[in-house]
Amino acid sequence: MGESEKISVGIIGASGYGGVQLVRLLQEHPLVDIVYLGGKGSAGQTYAEIYPHLGHAVDLTIEPIDTEAIASRCQVVFLGLPNGLACDIAPPLIAKGCKVLDLSADYRFKNLETYSSWYNKDRSDLDTAKTAVYGLPELYREEIKSASLIGCPGCYPTASLMALSPLLKQGLILPETTIIDAKSGTSGGGRQAKTHLLLAEAEGSFGAYGVAKHRHTPEIEQISSDLAGHEVKVQFTPHLIPMVRGILSTVYATLRDPGLVREDLLTIYSAFYRSSPFVKILPNGLYPQTKWACGTNLCYLGIETDPRTDRVIVLSAIDNLIKGQAGQAVQCLNIMMGWEETLGLPQLCFYP
């Protein structure tokens, strides 16, 4: 499709944090027209009632979820629903010719048994799931171009895989030594009321959760195994930090060649991501901060080696709601439609 014709887009699950980021980004996208916002509990409310700060720009009402009506009005549909719901909605939309981008975990896995064991939901949409492409453009750009269904990655996997991928693809590390230590702001937990996300609980505190059992673990392992060419298991531990948005993922692994130095790895990473406009490789001795990525679709990577332990340390900073969610979905849309990959996506952060 050329860059002169707007496409009609719908968003199901527009009332959550991922949904409002999609609305913000797509509202300013030059080749997109938002024609439908859908939801269950919020149906009947105007979008301005839910998010008053967008009332001057978005004159739409949340509508019931009706796949027949959606397919008749939308060429592309974004699904910003809780895990386990998209797999019931995506198949009929795709059957009617819509392109679908799912922000939940439903279409991230090649093996649905893995999904079912971690997300406690049996699946009957095997044929649809087989067509899904994992929506990490820096790794699967060519596959995304011809896809009709995108399983958009989770926020932690995005940050972690951006740091880890060159090491695995080039065979530079012993994969079984991989440790991922990641920290996220509270918006990663969604907009629903949860005790541990209350200001009184989160402020001034910092702790791990989902230790040895976080659902993003098998997602990271699936892509890591794909890159390495054999099964890879990683040690992944997420932490909640008292800020609204941002992820910092620190990846540790043992180098196969202890003689590799930071300058070697900077060259390797720069070559690996040479066609990736949102990846910023930091120079010697500079390490990323989450604020640098805030509000953008950028991923900052800092690299270090420790000759004392023969380990490589890679730090990755993203905005969990943009590159880790809505922005990456829009990036995939641009690729699917044959547009400039950066179209409508911010590259300048909110600062300070």
Swiss-Prot record:
Its EC number(s): 1.2.1.38
Active site as annotated: 155
Pfam families, alphabetized: Semialdhyde_dh, Semialdhyde_dhC_1
Entry GO terms, CC: cytoplasm
Residues annotated as transmembrane: none
Keywords: Amino-acid biosynthesis, Arginine biosynthesis, Cytoplasm, NADP, Oxidoreductase
EC main group: oxidoreductase
Catalytic reaction list: N-acetyl-L-glutamate 5-semialdehyde + phosphate + NADP(+) = N-acetyl-L-glutamyl 5-phosphate + NADPH + H(+)
Statement: the UniProt record of this protein carries the keyword Mitochondrion: no
Family the entry assigns: Belongs to the NAGSA dehydrogenase family. Type 1 subfamily.
Protein name as it appears in the record: N-acetyl-gamma-glutamyl-phosphate reductase
Species in which this protein is naturally found: Crocosphaera subtropica (strain ATCC 51142 / BH68) (Cyanothece sp. (strain ATCC 51142))
Lineage: Bacteria, Bacillati, Cyanobacteriota, Cyanophyceae, Oscillatoriophycideae
Gene: argC
